[in-house]
């Protein structure tokens, strides 16, 4: 099999990339606030996973879904939590 494989072919017309970027943009607020050591770790792992393994934001979010969900609930960030859960239900 030659060429690249698009593992998101079933997500055609779902805007998964834009939706993932929106969630990451909202998570950036938590990363910048640095109120929990996890956020620095998450930012570092995101960079590593993207650069070294070629993973996109949807996959990075999926890798940390339970922790992200818990922290967003604890912080009362229900809007970002809803966006994350929508990604989970529709695209993960």
Swiss-Prot record:
KW Ribonucleoprotein (keyword) present: no
The keyword DNA damage is annotated on this UniProt entry: no
Domain of life: Bacteria
Pfam families listed in its UniProt record: CowN
Gene Ontology biological-process annotations: nitrogen fixation
UniProt entry keywords in alphabetical sequence: Nitrogen fixation
Database matches in InterPro entries: CowN
Function: Is required to sustain N(2)-dependent growth in the presence of low levels of carbon monoxide (CO). Probably acts by protecting the N(2) fixation ability of the nitrogenase complex, which is inactivated in the presence of CO.
Family membership noted in the UniProt record: Belongs to the CowN family.
Protein name: N(2)-fixation sustaining protein CowN
């Amino acid at each position: 099999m030659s060429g690249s494989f698009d593992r998101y072919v079933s997500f055609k017309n779902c805007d998964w990339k834009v939706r993932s970027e929106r969630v990451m943009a909202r998570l950036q607020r938590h990363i910048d606030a640095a109120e929990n050591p996890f956020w620095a770790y998450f930012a570092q792992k995101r960079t590593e996973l993207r650069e070294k393994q070629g993973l996109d934001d949807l996959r990075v979010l999926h890798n940390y879904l339970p922790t992200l969900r818990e922290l967003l609930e604890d912080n009362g960030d229900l809007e970002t939590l809803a966006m994350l859960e929508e990604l989970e239900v529709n695209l993960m």
